[in-house]
C-alpha cells in the first residue's frame, strides 16, 4: 500500500510515488503478532488461519489474504473454498476494504516486550519499530556484529564499541579501538620505547637508529681494529681503552707501516724485473721483424724455396707467441700501476656521469610521451562513452513494444541492489513502451532497495507516463487501468497489483517535461519474499517485471 505526495496521509489503493516521508498503513504478514485482545475468527484467513493481509471476500462470504486467494486460484483449476467447499468464482471475489481497515486498527503488543510495553495498531507496527527504543539495530561501525538496542546505540558508538575509532595518543591518527594496543606497540612511529641497550633513556621509535649511533651503552669496535686491535666494548668505555692502550696502538700502527713499506719495496722490484723482460722481448721482436723482411725479399726473388717458407712460417708463429707474452706482461704492469693510480676510478666516474645525463634526457622524453599518451586515452574514452550511448539507444529501440505491455528483464540483481543500498543508483528505469504505434509513451521505474515506506525492506515499483511524439493527438488525462506484476519464473505465483488512474492527479496529465511523477506501490514485494530461495522470482541473478495497460475503449489513431 502506498500514499501520494499530494494525499496528506489518506489511504488509497494505488497512489503517486513519494520519495520523501510517505505515510503507510500496512503490516508484514510473515511476522507472528501478539494481539492485545484475542484475535476474532472473522479477522483470520480461511486458508492460512493467520491475520488477514489485504483481505478479499468470496461469493460465499469467507475472507482470504490476497496472497492466499491467488494461490488457491493458481494451484487449482477449479478453486474450492476450504470452509464450505463452494466453488470460488473469480468475478465474485472482491477486496474487503472495510475488513482491511478494521484489521489495520487492531492493537498489538510491541515484539520488544517486556522492555517496551507499547500498544500500537497493526497498521502502524512497522512505523513503531522504526522508532522503538528497544528495537535491536545494527551498529554503524564496520565489522561490529554486537546486537545493540536503539536506546543504547549512542553510548555504544561513543564508549563501548570495540570497532569505534579513537585517536592514538602519540601519532594522533584514527585507529580502531580493538587494534589500538597493537598499533601503539608495533606500528606507531611516535610511541616512546626504552633504549634496547638499557641505557635507561626513553626515545621515540623514529629516533631509535639515531640514538643507537650515540648511545653510550652500544657495543662498538676499537677505532684501531684496522691495525689489529680486537677489543670490542661499550661506547662509554672505548675512550678509556684508547688512553690505556695508547702504547699498544702505536706499536700496531708501526708494524702495519713496516708491512706496507716492505710490500711497496717488493712491488718496485717486481716492476723493474717486468720492465727488463719487456725490453728483452721488444728487442727480440725487432730482430724477428728484420728477419721477416729478409725472408720477404728472398720469397719475392724466388718463390720456389719451400724450406725458406717453412722457416718463415715458424718465425711468424714464434712472433705471434712473443706478442701475446708482451701483451700479458703489459696487463700485469698496468694492474700493478692501478694499485697506486686513480685514473681508472676517474674514468669510471666520467662513464657514470654520462649515463646519468643520458637517463635524464630519457626522463624528459618519457614525460613528453606520457603526456601524449594521456591525451590519446582521453579521446579514446570519449569515443567509448559515445559508442556506449549509441549501443544503449539501439537496444532500447529494438526492445520497444507497441501493444501496451512491457516485459522488463532486470539482470545483475545483486549488483544493482548493492548500488541502490550504497546510494549510487537508487532507482532504475525500464525501456519505454507504447499503447500503440501512435499511442501513449510509458515506462516503469523500480527501487530495488525500496522507496519511501518500503525503503530497506521492499522492492518498490512505479508506473510512469512519458512525453511522446503524438501527445497532442491523444486524450488527457491518461485513464487506462494498469497492472503491475512480478513474474514467477516457475509460472505458479505471480505477484500483481492493479489500479485505475486518478484523473485529478498530475501523474496522469499530459507531460510538461520528459516524464510525469511516477505512480505505483512503494511496498510492492518484500525482500524476504522476493529473495527467498524457495520461490522462483529470481533465477540466475535475473528477475522479470511486467506492466500491462488495459486497452479497452482506447481509440487507435
UniProtKB/Swiss-Prot annotation:
Primary gene name: TRAF5
Tissues and organs where the protein is expressed, per its UniProt entry: Expressed in spleen, thymus, prostate, testis, ovary, small intestine, colon, and peripheral blood.
Assembly: Homotrimer. Heteromer with TRAF3. Associates with TNFRSF5/CD40 through interaction with TRAF3. Associates with LTBR/TNFRSF3, TNFRSF4, TNFRSF8/CD30, TNFRSF11A/RANK, TNFRSF13B/TACI, TNFRSF14, TNFRSF17, TNFRSF19/TROY, RIPK2, MAP3K14, MAP3K5, and TRAF and TNF receptor associated protein TDP2. Interacts (via C-terminus) with EIF2AK2/PKR (via the kinase catalytic domain).
Stated family: Belongs to the TNF receptor-associated factor family. A subfamily.
SUPFAM superfamilies, per database record: RING/U-box, TRAF domain-like
Stretches for region Interaction with EIF2AK2/PKR: 345-557
Record domain MATH: where: 403-549
Coiled coil: 237-342
Subcellular location: Cytoplasm; Cytoplasm, Cytosol
Superkingdom of the source species: Eukaryota
One Gene Ontology term from the biological process aspect of the record: signal transduction
Zinc finger (TRAF-type): 127-181, 182-239
CDD domains: mRING-HC-C3HC3D_TRAF5
One GO CC annotation: cytosol
Alphabetical list of InterPro entries matching this protein: MATH/TRAF_dom, TNF_rcpt-assoc_TRAF_met, TRAF-like, TRAF1-6_MATH_dom, TRAF3/5_RING, TRAF5_C3HC3D_RING-HC_finger, Znf_RING, Znf_RING/FYVE/PHD
Domain comment, as recorded: The MATH/TRAF domain binds to receptor cytoplasmic domains.
Keywords: Apoptosis, Coiled coil, Cytoplasm, Isopeptide bond, Metal-binding, Repeat, Ubl conjugation, Zinc, Zinc-finger
Zn finger limits (RING-type): 45-85
Post-translational modification: Ubiquitinated at Lys-318 by the SCF(FBXL2) complex, leading to its degradation by the proteasome.
Cross-link (Glycyl lysine isopeptide (Lys-Gly) (interchain with G-Cter in ubiquitin)): 318
UniProt protein name: TNF receptor-associated factor 5
Pfam family, one: TRAF3_RING
Biological function: Adapter protein and signal transducer that links members of the tumor necrosis factor receptor family to different signaling pathways by association with the receptor cytoplasmic domain and kinases. Mediates activation of NF-kappa-B and probably JNK. Seems to be involved in apoptosis. Plays a role in mediating activation of NF-kappa-B by EIF2AK2/PKR.
Recorded GO MF terms: identical protein binding; signaling adaptor activity; thioesterase binding; tumor necrosis factor receptor binding; ubiquitin protein ligase activity; ubiquitin protein ligase binding; zinc ion binding
Amino acid at each position: 500500500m502506498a500514499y501520494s505526495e499530494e494525499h496528506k496521509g489518506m489511504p488509497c489503493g494505488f497512489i503517486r510515488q513519494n520519495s520523501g516521508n510517505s505515510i503507510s498503513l500496512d503490516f508484514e504478514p510473515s511476522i507472528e503478532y501478539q494481539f492485545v485482545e484475542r484475535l476474532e475468527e472473522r479477522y483470520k484467513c480461511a486458508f492460512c488461519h493467520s491475520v488477514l493481509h489485504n483481505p478479499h471476500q468470496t461469493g460465499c462470504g469467507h475472507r482470504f489474504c490476497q496472497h492466499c486467494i491467488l494461490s488457491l486460484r493458481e494451484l487449482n483449476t477449479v478453486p474450492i473454498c476450504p470452509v464450505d467447499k463452494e466453488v470460488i468464482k473469480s468475478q465474485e471475489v472482491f477486496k474487503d476494504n472495510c475488513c482491511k481497515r478494521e484489521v489495520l486498527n487492531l492493537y498489538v503488543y510491541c515484539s520488544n516486550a517486556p522492555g517496551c510495553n507499547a500498544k500500537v495498531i497493526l497498521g502502524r507496527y512497522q512505523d513503531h519499530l522504526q522508532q522503538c527504543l528497544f528495537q535491536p539495530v545494527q551498529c554503524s561501525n564496520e565489522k561490529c556484529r554486537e546486537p545493540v538496542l536503539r536506546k543504547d546505540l549512542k553510548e555504544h558508538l561513543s564508549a563501548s564499541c570495540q570497532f569505534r575509532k579513537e585517536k592514538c595518543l602519540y601519532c594522533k591518527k584514527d585507529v580502531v579501538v580493538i587494534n589500538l594496543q597493537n598499533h601503539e606497540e608495533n606500528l606507531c612511529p611516535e610511541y616512546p620505547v626504552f633504549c634496547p641497550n638499557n641505557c635507561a633513556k626513553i626515545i621515540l621509535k623514529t629516533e631509535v637508529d639515531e640514538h643507537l649511533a650515540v648511545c653510550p651503552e652500544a657495543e662498538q669496535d676499537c677505532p684501531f681494529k684496522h691495525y689489529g686491535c680486537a677489543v670490542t666494548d661499550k661506547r662509554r668505555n672505548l675512550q678509556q681503552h684508547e688512553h690505556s692502550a695508547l702504547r699498544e696502538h702505536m706499536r700496531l700502527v708501526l708494524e702495519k707501516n713496516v708491512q706496507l713499506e716492505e710490500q711497496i719495496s717488493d712491488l718496485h722490484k717486481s716492476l723493474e724485473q717486468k720492465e727488463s723482460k719487456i725490453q728483452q722481448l721488444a728487442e727480440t721482436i725487432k730482430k724477428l721483424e728484420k728477419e721477416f723482411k729478409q725472408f720477404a725479399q728472398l720469397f719475392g726473388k724466388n718463390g720456389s724455396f719451400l724450406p725458406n717458407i717453412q722457416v718463415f712460417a715458424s718465425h711468424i708463429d714464434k712472433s705471434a707467441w712473443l706478442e701475446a707474452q708482451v701483451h700479458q706482461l703489459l696487463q700485469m704492469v698496468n694492474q700493478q700501476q692501478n694499485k697506486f693510480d686513480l685514473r681508472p676510478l676517474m674514468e669510471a666516474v666520467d662513464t657514470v656521469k654520462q649515463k646519468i645525463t643520458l637517463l635524464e634526457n630519457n626522463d624528459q622524453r618519457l614525460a613528453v610521451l606520457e603526456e601524449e599518451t594521456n591525451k590519446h586515452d582521453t579521446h579514446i574514452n570519449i569515443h567509448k562513452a559515445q559508442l556506449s550511448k549509441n549501443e544503449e539507444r539501439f537496444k532500447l529501440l529494438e526492445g520497444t513494444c507497441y501493444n501496451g505491455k512491457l516485459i522488463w528483464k532486470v539482470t545483475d540483481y545483486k549488483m544493482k541492489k548493492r548500488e541502490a543500498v550504497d546510494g549510487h543508483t537508487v532507482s532504475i528505469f525500464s525501456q519505454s513502451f507504447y499503447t500503440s504505434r501512435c499511442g501513449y509513451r510509458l515506462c516503469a521505474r523500480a527501487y530495488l532497495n525500496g522507496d519511501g515506506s518500503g525503503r530497506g525492506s521492499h522492492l518498490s515499483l512505479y508506473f510512469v507516463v512519458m512525453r511522446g511524439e503524438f501527445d497532442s493527438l491523444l486524450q488527457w488525462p491518461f485513464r487506462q487501468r494498469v497492472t503491475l506484476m512480478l513474474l514467477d519464473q516457475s509460472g505458479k505465483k505471480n505477484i500483481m497489483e492493479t489500479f485505475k488512474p486518478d484523473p485529478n492527479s498530475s501523474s496522469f496529465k499530459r507531460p510538461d517535461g520528459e516524464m510525469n511523477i511516477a505512480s505505483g506501490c512503494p511496498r510492492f514485494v518484500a525482500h524476504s519474499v522476493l529473495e527467498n530461495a524457495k520461490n522462483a522470482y529470481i533465477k540466475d541473478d535475473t528477475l522479470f517485471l511486467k506492466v500491462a495497460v488495459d486497452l479497452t475503449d482506447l481509440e487507435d489513431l
